[in-house]
Amino acid sequence: FVTRRRGGGQNATTTIHAVELNAPDEEHLVYERDGDVELTDDPGTLAYMEGPNGGRVVRTSTDGTHVFLTGTQYFENPDQDAPRPFADRVEIATGDTERIWQSSDDIYESIGTVVDRDMTEMIVARQGPTLYPNQYSVNLATGEDRQVTFNEDPTPEITGAHRERFMVRRPDGFESVVEVTMPVGWETGDPAPPAMFWFYPREYDDQESYDERARTYNKNAFPSFGTRSMEYLVRLGYAVVEPDAPIVGPQGRMNDNYEHDLRNNLAAVIDELDRREIIDRQRLGLGGHSYGAFSTVNAMVHTPFFKAGIAGDGNYNRTLTPMAFQSERRLLWEARDVYLSMSP
């Protein structure tokens, strides 16, 4: 299999051709992907398997006539349509493609292990908003579907807490997502609870680039609860607020707007949650890890919104990273004012 790239940078077109070693002048196009392809049109990537020498080789069918592509289909509106992983079979001689498996639209399934060479039997991870992740043996030839693991939710109080997800609009018109997990036992009409914000700002060129990334949201995922999650606070009467915090500007100059966008993001979220009467804006905390910790300290210094902050493992003096940081590619000597203003 031969890979070719036409063009340069992010817009390069990648093609993969099958070549018979006994007829090297004869090629078959099995895959083509434009660098600027929309996320919703991504054709996937070649599937691989372990070769006879233990290395990774392209997965071909038993008779050698087909290869396989795996990927995830995304949709324009992720709040309506969840991502759906898939597997395609491609005939080498003609390039004809057949979809042999795809995740359901009401739960999230992903291929964990392929059991046989022809991808007729596989182990699939399956989860849903109320379905705890487990593994299933799926046989596409016989239709057999058998559960093989029986894991149970260890924190049902937390994962079962009421959640809300919606868009907020900044004064400049930029829209972003916020997710809120309400305290255990809280019901609409109850007094607004105190809230803990947990965030990690990211940089974007514009609204379109933010929206493109937001399309990967998976509404069919089981609510995750990791070791760094603040959601355990819902058991203590707090709402946990996880806002996107987009820092927006021209490529290479996003941080010119860092303080402005940080303040406006948080203000827009607080105003909207206060309007919905699901937080007490007089009792707010803020926290984050790494760049989220750095941004927590900046928010504590540059905004009046929070009574306390938790900053874990951050770098709070950008002059100590003079050769760039995060998406900032200018050196300290090229953007001195930005580096200093972002060093609380």
Indicate residue ranges for each PLM-predicted region.
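C-terminal substrate/ligand-recognition segments
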Residues: 9, 59-60, 69, 74-80, ...
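Active-site-proximal cap/loop segments of hydrolase catalytic domains
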Residues: 208, 212-344
